């Protein structure tokens, strides 16, 4: 996915007021009655009204080949909402909709189109509020208080399906095969698409499509579906329905990065910061029993305890995985933070990263060459920067208009309080000293001498994540740092955005009239002792970058107010999310991986042991999506990332990359 920005759809409206694609010269829905056609073709064709009450799983997964205006999704959501009202005790509790769209509508066009269906307004307004930027890849939207999940994959469906992770295989309960007519858009209706539909369909899955074209019917039959014709809607004579009656065995293309989940729904999370807080919520939403063990007397005592933290995506001049992951993580984080029913200090004031010297200017130029959507990142010259940030910098940069700052300490504690209301059990002053697999559970031992047993365990305890026998070989390291708290002044109070340079400076928090400036960096140092030199350096870096700025000289660190914390990082600047890998088994099983990829077994891991760590300095950006990824993996649900980006987050990646090249792992 080298292309990051997606071209939005170009629309016009015909005499009936129906939107028409200029790209394909075809209507988005029937001129007669698009809503009733959707109900007939897709809901009726998949027999959803019959299947929902007898569905034996808490989640029903629908996949769709063209999102368009969202009519199919909104109609299904309305029907699912009615089903839940009429059957509150049913096993089926949640709906997951996966859809692909090459040319997404703009938010304005979406809202205009939705005016056709006033009865769908309650659901359409929620969709419009979370409508993502035209950015390639998967956008996960959590709707209806988490009861409905929408995965919007922006891009060409036949390219995207090749990039789907193997964990989506045999998960789909029903397919909506939609899109522009085969005669108008032949590139979509391919054997590759039909085979992908079969690969993702679970045994017994159904499909429905408005077309009755012979090559479509034959292609789906060859892929494994049993097909039949059904009377079409309105003036259309026929449509197609199908059932996956076979049990296919899809191959796993990269077993060394395979992710396994759990059939159980009980876990212990070790941590107390933002990662463990958000993971608790994500698992509780899926019906898990969750116990949180925290070594401290309250949450957010570690790296998540700062007063202000900047929220913006990390971009790289050369690493494609970073450029795929962080923009997606950032947009998901904004949607999640905005939807949380909790209060915490924050201001989405924007973040501007400055090019204060030649090296930083070259770096920013390479970041801008990614051509990300303007709503995510765009260039500023020196004059525009001054207007945006409120102070004179005499340099331009790259701005993130949807970024800003928040209080990690307040957020973490508020999320854990919310999770506690939803059933989270908390155990503070519990320092985990060891864990061992015992039969089908994990035995935990704490410094107090206490012990506990749990079906699964998640390690989300920051820089202490490699303190155990199972995790000691992980290539992670601690980074100590100090953030200085400074009082505002008339000149500093003019700062309207977070400034990033060879450090960062936040606007004042109006609730305490303080700014945060930082942060020092001490790799391999776990000390949380205040340092006078760090305090001085935090100020000096600002002055070095902007020697002529009078406002910068007003930064006063003399009252020695600061906070010291320790982060956990990796050398490739990406988190580690997934199963805890078995280091020794990995080296043994994959000793000849470079020459025997075809016979490789799935990645050796510790069953039931997971991790969410190495978030580095961008935990506020990455933690929400990482928590969602891990909760989905543990629950055997669709994961909202492509396979190559997921591989770049796999805790075993640094070892496996060497083994794939025939190199020794040190």
From Swiss-Prot:
Pfam families: DAO, Methyltransf_30. Its cofactor is FAD. It comes from the Bacteria. It is found in: Cytoplasm. GO terms for biological process: methylation; tRNA wobble uridine modification. It catalyses: 5-aminomethyl-2-thiouridine(34) in tRNA + S-adenosyl-L-methionine = 5-methylaminomethyl-2-thiouridine(34) in tRNA + S-adenosyl-L-homocysteine + H(+). SUPFAM superfamilies: FAD/NAD(P)-binding domain (SSF51905). Residues 1-245 are annotated as: tRNA (mnm(5)s(2)U34)-methyltransferase. Its EC number is 2.1.1.61, 1.5.-.-. Keywords: Cytoplasm, FAD, Flavoprotein, Methyltransferase, Multifunctional enzyme, Oxidoreductase, S-adenosyl-L-methionine, Transferase, tRNA processing. Residues 270-666 are annotated as: FAD-dependent cmnm(5)s(2)U34 oxidoreductase. Its main location: cytoplasm. GO terms for molecular function: flavin adenine dinucleotide binding; oxidoreductase activity, acting on the CH-NH group of donors; tRNA (5-methylaminomethyl-2-thiouridylate)(34)-methyltransferase activity. InterPro entries: FAD-dep_OxRdtase (IPR006076), FAD/NAD-bd_sf (IPR036188), MnmC-like_methylTransf (IPR008471), SAM-dependent_MTases_sf (IPR029063), tRNA_MAMT_biosynth_bifunc_MnmC (IPR023032), tRNA_MNMC2 (IPR047785), tRNA_S-uridine_synth_MnmC_C (IPR017610). HAMAP family: MnmC (MF_01102). Catalyzes the last two steps in the biosynthesis of 5-methylaminomethyl-2-thiouridine (mnm(5)s(2)U) at the wobble position (U34) in tRNA. Catalyzes the FAD-dependent demodification of cmnm(5)s(2)U34 to nm(5)s(2)U34, followed by the transfer of a methyl group from S-adenosyl-L-methionine to nm(5)s(2)U34, to form mnm(5)s(2)U34. In the N-terminal section; belongs to the methyltransferase superfamily. tRNA (mnm(5)s(2)U34)-methyltransferase family. NCBIfam families: MnmC_Cterm (TIGR03197), PRK01747.1-1 (NF002480), PRK01747.1-2 (NF002481), PRK01747.1-3 (NF002482), PRK01747.1-5 (NF002484), tRNA_MNMC2 (NF033855). This is tRNA 5-methylaminomethyl-2-thiouridine biosynthesis bifunctional protein MnmC. It comes from Salmonella arizonae (strain ATCC BAA-731 / CDC346-86 / RSK2980). The gene is mnmC.
